[in-house]
């Protein structure tokens, strides 16, 4: 068997009849499967042991040879080879057909390959193949044309008229004759000439035909192989037949389909031997053709063949297609051994790198390790008795288990795994009970809660896998979120509430007492002299003088209070206690700790202390937070929800105003639309007033207020609904109902108010489930389009980059600073201080936060950085163009699968995006798509709803109106002008006399990215897509780094469309990879020919995924049969560069530690090294 790691590429093509016979171990002649009495396979049937191998290991059919010593002998009685039974998964058979039949993929696919190469319409071809018409194969010297169709009557007439002077036939035989006669080289030449000379539909048709002809020419496939003479029979264990209890059999649908083919084939042979009348033979041939069609792709033509209960049978094509097909079910995702799942509960006592594993589960997962150790330690004599000990759970087993799991990490995974933080490694700690315990701080990454969530455990087995889990995947090493580089293990909920309560001061500002040392203050607190929240003054100590300042010991000394050492500070007892658990480098934070501050602390810790210490630091804050959340006794009682006193007054005022508006409307002073808008505005304002009085009246130590202000749970709008008023509600279509809900939940709603608010609730629930599905599908497409983007080299040497400029509004306020766009990126050129002339950042140096600050301080408004959009690496990107790896904060390593990370970073927050489409109200009823559908629209490069008109050249605008139609004319400086007519109801964004640039929007709406590509070129459309996607995410408060979106945009713009092939081998109208296009042109120019001309194309992510070089990746994505048909005809070779292809064939992925450059590193465990060392000493 060929080792999977030793081949570089995999090729697919058409199989010739000889090839199929070569694969086969014998012909299946009978439709029988197994004998109903003996339950052994019938000879020459679909499960025949002589063809496919024995059903039991080392045993022939008749039982003459049993046992392994007869290995390889072929039994002289029954003809079965004595070998392993698993050959029944590998050996194929074949069926010799009495008449050739066509392969439905090549005849029925769109476009029909057979029809194109013969230049016959698919409908005419269908008539011939299914015996409804004759086709002339050789007109001889008659006036008939080759490939002319004749009806039954016409055929008879011409036969009587011309006798045997012409040849005509029907069915696949006739088509085969035509296919064998084709001269591909000559056809290719004629078609190339035709493409150059004709235009319109004929040109398109010729181009399509040329593509198919070229495919056959280059691949070495023969066109007549599209007609089958022999049919391969797949191995029986891949279409099994199993006995159910009750003596009935369950069988794979393929057996039924094969059986029909064999029955019809045998009947046809018999009829031919008998010399039956032509009409009967013809009918039988047609039925054979239909049976083979059903076997290959049931339901592609006509009604599908159904089994019991009217269920269509699953054909060979269905076995590959869809989520349950071979690709997605068995090749891309397999079930694995050494895994288990259980409910999760919180483990607040755990360290960040630990998880609690139930004893029983651990024993089962680590069984082989435990058994080996039991034998090695002499507790058991052999593996069998060790196994018995484990099964009986003897006491010594538990001690051995403790030893085995020490230092052996396990992987925990929670479905759905939306990003790479959904699988992390932990050191197991054995716990009683049957629930897995997880650390509270990793819940954010897993998006886990404890309302019954389950998680799966996997055990990495090999030394390499363990090393990877420990070094790369340990939870304590995954502190930053790859999507934005922010810490993902920030303490929240109870921990945050505890820290907030602890650091919250009393409203009075005078210090209650003064202390000479923190310990003294602590003593006073413990003796009840001061409270946690009292303002006090404390003098903080300094680290001992004998320690060298800024040395490791100096920093680690508990008396080092950093910024406040040796000073007297006004603070609270609680804040002092909080700072005590902080590392000296982070002190002293004299603030009330809420969500933002907590994030800042973790961020500072990561930058100043590194990974390991940050993990320790978060654990300390976690413990402190839990302790004081408990101590605070913060609960919600109904008395904590206080309704503001002047609510009634505000409502009365609002009602008065609404009455006034209604009166104005009845008098005809305002339109209904204005009345509606006014009423909505009045109630919104009333609600805001209630909210602001509510905020003023709430006390600092009110638990509801503490939860909200700390950011632990709830927001101001929820509290307004509890204690203020619920306000306006939307109806099912999203329109706001002008009747507000005046009550709050504390007072209780009336029946009508309750009913009004149910609309919104239902919409919310429906939206959530729809959103989850859509978001998952979007992620799948993103992963597919970018899965082969891997960091392949250090520097691609490009001279291009993208320039970010600070954006300011007309008053000089900065709308968009450049800092977020340039941090973590590599500078293209030296960045020089405009006044002093010193170089702040050298070319090819990464810009970190400090350098970005310096750039900002120097007043530099424009920076050019390296970007993946301009990267010149062929099958991926280079380190310099990608910049910082956000999960580590350092420059990305070669081998990082940045495409997948980008897809996850965009897809994971997708569930948070809304589904709603906004209503602008009034006449302009064009909904502006927002939220998730907008992201999808952008990535799929669709024509947007509510499309804006864009300027096609730079120039001055003039707006004219005639007969109620508005027109915008743009006149450029050289006198050229373009006029656009504005559709009714569109809102114009420009004024007469204004100067616009090409690509600017003239009316409101979304721009069609294809138009933008035409007008502004690559750079313009890249900018636009990046901006628009960011806009949607920013609206929801989701922060995603530019580089992730850039990777997607780069993949969408990888192809060019050939306009004129010149002297190249490229096909006109074909899509080619930019790099292949450049190579081909370079080759032609070197030979002195005319290069090809092409224009860049923007493909949606689905199209781009299917247009990849890898047919395995494309076939496993969507439209499996179409992709495989195309690949087979072209004889495509898959270079196995991406991740999916390698997973499918079972190789290590070419990313991370699976890259070629890391292949020859071998890992040793300490014991191995120690043993070798001892051996060396003995020698």
From Swiss-Prot:
Pfam families, sorted: RNA_pol_Rpb1_1, RNA_pol_Rpb1_2, RNA_pol_Rpb1_3, RNA_pol_Rpb1_4, RNA_pol_Rpb1_5
Keyword Ribosomal protein among record annotations: no
InterPro entries documented for this protein: DNA-dir_RpoC_beta_prime (IPR045867), DNA-dir_RpoC_beta_prime_bact (IPR012754), RNA_pol_asu (IPR000722), RNA_pol_N (IPR006592), RNA_pol_Rpb1_1 (IPR007080), RNA_pol_Rpb1_3 (IPR007066), RNA_pol_Rpb1_3_sf (IPR042102), RNA_pol_Rpb1_4 (IPR007083)
Molecular function in Gene Ontology: DNA binding; DNA-directed RNA polymerase activity; magnesium ion binding; zinc ion binding
Cofactor details (free text): Binds 1 Mg(2+) ion per subunit.
Binding site for Mg(2+): 449, 451, 453
GO annotation, cellular component aspect: DNA-directed RNA polymerase complex
Binding site for Zn(2+) 2: 796, 871, 878, 881
The entry's keywords: DNA-directed RNA polymerase, Magnesium, Metal-binding, Nucleotidyltransferase, Transcription, Transferase, Zinc
Catalytic activity: RNA(n) + a ribonucleoside 5'-triphosphate = RNA(n+1) + diphosphate
Cofactor(s) it depends on: Mg(2+); Zn(2+)
Highest taxon of source: Bacteria
EC number(s) on file: 2.7.7.6
CDD domains: RNAP_beta'_C, RNAP_beta'_N
UniProt keyword tRNA-binding, yes or no: no
Biological process terms in GO annotation: DNA-templated transcription
Family per record: Belongs to the RNA polymerase beta' chain family.
Subunit comment: The RNAP catalytic core consists of 2 alpha, 1 beta, 1 beta' and 1 omega subunit. When a sigma factor is associated with the core the holoenzyme is formed, which can initiate transcription.
Function noted in UniProt: DNA-dependent RNA polymerase catalyzes the transcription of DNA into RNA using the four ribonucleoside triphosphates as substrates.
Name of this protein: DNA-directed RNA polymerase subunit beta'
Gene: rpoC
């Amino acid at each position: 068997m060929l080792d999977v790691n030793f081949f570089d590429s995999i090729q697919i093509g058409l199989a010739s009849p000889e090839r199929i016979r070569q694969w086969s171990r014998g012909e299946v002649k009978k439709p029988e499967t197994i004998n109903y009495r003996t339950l052994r396979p019938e000879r020459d049937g679909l499960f025949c042991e002589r063809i496919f191998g024995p059903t039991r290991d080392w045993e022939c059919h008749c039982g003459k040879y049993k046992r392994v010593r007869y290995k390889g002998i072929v039994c002289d009685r029954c003809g079965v080879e004595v070998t392993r039974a698993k050959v029944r998964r590998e050996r194929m058979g074949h069926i010799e057909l009495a008449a050739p039949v066509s392969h439905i993929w090549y005849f029925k696919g769109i476009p029909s390959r057979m029809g194109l190469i013969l230049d016959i319409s698919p409908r005419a071809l269908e008539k011939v193949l299914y015996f409804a018409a004759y086709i002339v194969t050789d007109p001889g010297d008659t006036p008939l044309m080759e490939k002319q169709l004749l009806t039954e009557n016409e055929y008879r007439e011409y036969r009587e008229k011309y006798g045997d002077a012409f040849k005509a036939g029907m069915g696949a035989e006739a088509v085969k004759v035509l296919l064998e006669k084709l001269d591909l080289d000559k056809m290719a030449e004629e078609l190339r000439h035709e493409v150059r000379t004709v235009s319109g539909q004929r040109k398109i048709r010729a181009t399509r035909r040329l593509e198919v002809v070229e495919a056959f020419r280059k691949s070495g496939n023969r066109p007549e192989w599209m007609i089958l003479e022999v049919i391969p029979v797949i191995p029986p264990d891949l279409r099994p037949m199993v006995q159910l209890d009750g003596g009935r059999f369950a069988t794979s649908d393929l057996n039924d389909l094969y059986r029909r083919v064999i029955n019809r084939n045998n009947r046809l042979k018999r009829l031919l031997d008998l010399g039956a009348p032509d009409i009967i033979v013809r009918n039988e041939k047609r039925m054979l053709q239909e049976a083979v069609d059903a076997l290959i792709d049931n339901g592609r033509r006509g009604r599908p063949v159904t089994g019991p209960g009217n269920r269509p049978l699953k054909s060979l094509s269905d076995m590959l297609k869809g989520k349950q097909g071979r690709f997605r079910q068995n090749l891309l995702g397999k079930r694995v051994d050494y895994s288990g799942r259980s409910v999760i509960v919180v483990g607040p006592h755990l360290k960040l790198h630990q998880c609690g594993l139930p004893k029983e589960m651990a024993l089962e997962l680590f069984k082989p390790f435990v058994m080996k150790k039991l034998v090695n330690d002499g507790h058991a004599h052999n593996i069998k008795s060790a196994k018995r000990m484990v099964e009986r759970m003897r006491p010594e087993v538990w001690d051995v288990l403790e030893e085995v799991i020490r230092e052996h990490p396990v992987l925990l995974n929670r479905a759905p795994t939306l990003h790479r933080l959904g699988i992390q490694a932990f050191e197991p700690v054995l716990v009683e009970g049957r629930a897995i315990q997880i650390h509270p701080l990793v819940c954010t990454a897993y998006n886990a809660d404890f309302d019954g969530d389950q998680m799966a455990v996997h055990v990495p087995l090999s030394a390499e896998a363990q090393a990877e889990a420990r070094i790369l995947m340990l939870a304590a090493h995954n502190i930053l979120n790859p999507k934005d580089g922010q810490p993902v293990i920030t303490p929240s909920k109870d921990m945050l509430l505890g820290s907030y309560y602890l650091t919250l001061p009393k409203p009075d500002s005078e210090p209650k007492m003064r202390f000479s040392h923190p310990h003294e203050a602590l003593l006073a607190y413990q003796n009840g002299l001061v409270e946690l929240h009292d303002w006090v003054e404390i003098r903080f100590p300094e680290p001992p003088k004998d320690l060298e300042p800024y040395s490791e010991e100096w920093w680690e000394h508990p008396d080092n209070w950093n910024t406040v050492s040796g000073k007297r500070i006004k603070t609270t007892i609680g804040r002092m206690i909080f700072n005590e658990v902080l590392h000296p480098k982070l002190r002293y934070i004299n603030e009330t700790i809420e969500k933002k501050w907590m994030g800042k602390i973790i961020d500072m810790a990561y930058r100043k202390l590194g990974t390991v210490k940050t993990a320790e630091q978060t654990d300390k804050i976690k413990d402190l937070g839990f302790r004081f959340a408990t101590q605070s006794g913060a609960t919600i009682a109904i008395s904590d929800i206080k309704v503001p006193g002047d609510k009634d007054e505000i409502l009365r005022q609002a009602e008065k105003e609404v009455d006034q508006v209604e009166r104005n409307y009845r008098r005809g002073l305002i339109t209904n639309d204005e009345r509606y808008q006014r009423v909505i505005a009045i109630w919104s304002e009333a609600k805001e007033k209630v909210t602001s009085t509510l905020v003023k009246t709430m006390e600092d130590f009110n638990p509801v207020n503490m939860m909200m202000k700390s950011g632990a749970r709830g927001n101001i709008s929820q509290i307004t609904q509890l204690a203020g008023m619920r306000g306006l509600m939307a109806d099912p279509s999203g329109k706001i109902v002008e009747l507000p809900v005046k009550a709050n939940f504390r007072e209780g709603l009336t029946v009508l108010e309750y009913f009004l608010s149910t609309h919104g609730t239902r919409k919310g629930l429906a939206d959530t489930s729809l959103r989850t599905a859509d978001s998952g599908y979007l992620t799948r497409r993103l992963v597919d389009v970018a899965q082969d983007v891997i960091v392949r080299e250090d520097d691609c040497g490009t001279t291009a980059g993208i320039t970010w400029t600070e954006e300011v509004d007309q008053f000089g306020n900065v709308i968009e600073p450049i800092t977020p766009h340039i941090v973590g990126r590599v500078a293209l050129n030296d960045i020089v201080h405009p006044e002093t002339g010193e170089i702040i950042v050298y070319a090819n140096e990464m810009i970190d936060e400090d350098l970005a600050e310096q750039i900002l301080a120097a007043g530099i408004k424009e920076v050019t950085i390296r970007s993946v959009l301009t990267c010149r690496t062929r099958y991926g990107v280079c380190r310099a163009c990608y910049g910082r790896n956000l999960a580590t904060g350092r420059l990305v390593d070669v081998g990082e699968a940045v495409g997948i990370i980008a897809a996850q970073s965009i897809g994971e927050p997708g569930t948070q995006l809304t589904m709603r489409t906004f209503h602008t109200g009034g006449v302009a009823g064009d909904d502006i798509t927002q939220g998730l559908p907008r992201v999808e629209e952008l990535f799929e490069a669709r024509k947007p709803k509510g499309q804006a008109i864009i300027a096609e050249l730079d120039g001055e605008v003039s707006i004219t109106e005639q007969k109620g139609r508005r027109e915008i004319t743009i006149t450029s400086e050289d006198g050229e002008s373009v006029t656009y007519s504005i559709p009714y109801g569109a809102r114009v964004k420009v004024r007469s006399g204004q100067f616009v640039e090409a690509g600017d929007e003239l009316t409101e709406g979304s721009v069609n990215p294809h138009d933008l590509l035409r007008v502004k070129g690559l750079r313009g459309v890249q900018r636009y897509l990046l901006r628009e996607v960011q806009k949607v995410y920013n609206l929801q408060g989701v922060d995603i780094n530019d580089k992730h979106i850039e990777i997607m945009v780069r993949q969408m713009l990888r192809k060019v469309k050939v306009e004129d092939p010149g002297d190249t081998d490229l096909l006109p109208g074909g899509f080619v990879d930019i790099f292949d296009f450049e190579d081909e042109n370079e080759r032609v120019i070197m030979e002195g020919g005319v290069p090809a001309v092409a224009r860049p194309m923007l493909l949606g992510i689905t199209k781009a995924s299917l247009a990849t070089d890898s047919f395995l990746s494309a076939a496993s994505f969507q439209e499996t049969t179409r992709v495989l048909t195309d690949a087979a005809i072209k004889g495509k070779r898959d270079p196995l560069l991406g991740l999916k292809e390698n997973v499918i064939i079972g190789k290590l992925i070419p990313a991370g530690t699976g890259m070629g450059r890391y292949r020859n590193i071998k890992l040793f465990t300490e014991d191995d090294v120690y043993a070798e060392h001892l051996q060396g000493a003995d020698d």
